[in-house]
Amino acid sequence: MADFLLRPIKQRHRNEDKYVSVDAADGSVSKIEPIADFVIKTKLLSANGPEKLQDGRKVFINVCHSPLVPKPEVDFNARIVFPLIIQNEWEIPIITSCYRMDHDKKGQECYVWDCCINSDCSRWICDDIQLREILVEWCLESCEIRDSVVLCRDRIAFPKMKKKGAELPALEVLNDELHQDYKAKMHKIIEEEAGDPMSILRGRNDDGDDNNDPDDGTLPPLFPIENKISGAKIEEIDKNEIAHRNLKQAPAPAPAPHEQQEDVPEYEVKMKRFKGAAYKLRILIENKAPNSKPDRFSPSYNFAENILYINGKLSIPLPRDIVVNAADIKIFHIRKERTLYIYI
């Protein structure tokens, strides 16, 4: 995630430009007064950081924008950008504040984050609903990284408000952060992500008991490869000895119980039609199996049958005349959530 960590400030600078650059002891910083756009509402599942946040509390994320925030090198074009997103080659930079306390309508304490993007990016997400949904996920991830928390994805809402709170605190960030190569930083974070504790759940590469199912990022062979036993000794035997051994050879032992368990997916499919949008249909596919690995999606489309197949185990008949060109089907995979978004 290409997020920039910063701290909010209480004072606001009332000047016509809405932001001002000042000199700090360790370099120049920029103070940004974000412009409110919309609000994401969810709840806190858990917190692992030094701050003592209470599980189950409501969370509000103010999505805002400013012309000072960097934007991607490539301007948004659906046909160009969505394939780049799938390859982790395009992302909207997000300046994420630390959390602050507030109260909901019932007077209960809640947590608020601010996620600020470039003003051009704000216009892009208004024009493309798929990019908007992707940005929502990026904002959730950015807040999680910022304060070491886990946010709920099952009950996300969008209240009819521009912002949560009386005002949006100004943001302060080093100019070096604003002008750094965020793309290089994004790739570095992606590489580091492979070594985080979650990789144990995804691949269990460090567990000797799961060596039969490695997840090292490589594709399995097309045809089965015979297992080779290393360290076997070479001995000279005759044909009679071979026949004698074959007769006495015991049947192969039954596999251990954990080897018999199959990764059986449990798919939940939701469809939603859109009128007057760039896409006519959105299909949300989520794997609810508790032990399923995050990267077990392999979608394919049969134009003659007008059926969408997932891993060869799930078939989804599509409405007539909804697929004009199979190349126009857009797929976005949120790996950690084991969720597949398909836009037609």
From Swiss-Prot:
Disulfide bonds: none
InterPro entries: PIH1/Kintoun_subfamily, Pih1_CS_Ascomycota, PIH1_N
GO biological process, one term: protein stabilization
Main location class: cytoplasm
Superkingdom to which the source organism belongs: Eukaryota
GO annotations of cellular component type: cytoplasm; nucleus; R2TP complex; ribonucleoprotein complex
Keyword Protein biosynthesis among record annotations: no
Function, as annotated: Involved in pre-rRNA processing and required for the NOP58-snoRNA interaction.
Family: Belongs to the PIH1 family.
Subunit structure: Component of the R2TP complex composed at least of RVB1, RVB2, TAH1 and PIH1. Also interacts with HSP90, RRP43, NOP53 and NOP58.
Miscellaneous remark of the record: Present with 2610 molecules/cell in log phase SD medium.
Record protein name field: Protein interacting with Hsp90 1
The species this protein was found in: Saccharomyces cerevisiae (strain ATCC 204508 / S288c) (Baker's yeast)
Gene encoding the protein: PIH1
